């Protein structure tokens, strides 16, 4: 074996170690040869990976990118009420997982079309948010609605334009969405377009946001 420094039983590792090391989507079998994998630190590495000792394949897991945008029309912001878990029934901006083979701006525009049937022009970057516990990076852009022909996509219960004063802050789905919205509005009032950064992580039984 090339990885003798640390070997961890696969089941126990997934339950206890995934928070900082590997994704909680536990891998049991090698996608290359079909044999069982184990979690270990490969030689020359510093983090546990899923390793197949039969064929030697090391399966790397890396953070996922969530791309989204804040579409605006005549001063109002387009929000979607989620039809799926997590946080079903809460409001969010159009956003979702980036696909292979697309640019992050194109992913944000696609998500707006899928979730809100909205045709948007992607603008400057609002925020980059490191959601460390879930191994995600949330990237949110400013956007302009090209028209008001939006509607309810399959992942939304409702889609609506909101004046700043009417945004349902108590019903916003995720801390990352609230961060992006508030920074967007701060910048709009100040007539500027900045990019904002923060980390969201789990401390003492709750999510904590820290600006960078």
Which positions does each model-derived feature cover?
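Unchanged
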Residues: 98-121, 125-183, 187-188, 192-194, ...
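Conserved Nudix-box catalytic region and its N-terminal flanking loop in Nudix hydrolases
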Residues: 72-114
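Conserved hydrophobic/aromatic beta-strand scaffold that supports enzyme active sites
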Residues: 29, 49, 70, 79, ...
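Leucine-biased recognition of intrinsically disordered, low-complexity hydrophobic segments
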Residues: 6, 21-22
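Acidic, metal-coordinating catalytic segment for phosphate/diphosphate chemistry
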Residues: 28-68
């Amino acid at each position: 074996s090339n990885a003798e420094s640390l070997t961890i039983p696969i089941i126990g590792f997934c339950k206890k170690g995934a928070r900082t090391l590997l994704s909680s989507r536990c891998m049991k079998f090698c996608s290359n040869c079909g044999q069982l994998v184990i979690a270990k630190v490969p030689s020359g590495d510093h983090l546990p990976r899923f390793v197949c000792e039969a064929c030697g394949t090391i399966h790397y897991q890396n953070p996922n990118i969530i791309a989204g945008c804040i579409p605006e029309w005549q001063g109002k912001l387009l929000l979607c009420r989620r039809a799926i878990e997590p946080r079903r029934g809460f409001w969010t901006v159009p956003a979702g997982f980036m696909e292979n083979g697309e640019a992050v701006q194109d992913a944000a525009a696609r998500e707006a079309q899928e979730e809100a049937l909205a045709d948007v022009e992607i603008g400057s970057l609002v925020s980059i948010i490191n959601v460390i516990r879930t191994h995600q990076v949330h990237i949110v852009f400013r956007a302009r609605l090209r028209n008001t022909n939006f509607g309810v996509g399959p992942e939304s219960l409702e889609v609506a334009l909101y004046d700043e004063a009417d945004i349902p802050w108590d019903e916003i789905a995720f801390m990352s969405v609230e961060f992006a919205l508030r920074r967007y509005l701060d910048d709009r009032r100040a007539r500027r377009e900045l990019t904002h950064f923060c980390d969201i992580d789990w401390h003492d039984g709750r999510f904590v946001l820290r600006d960078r």
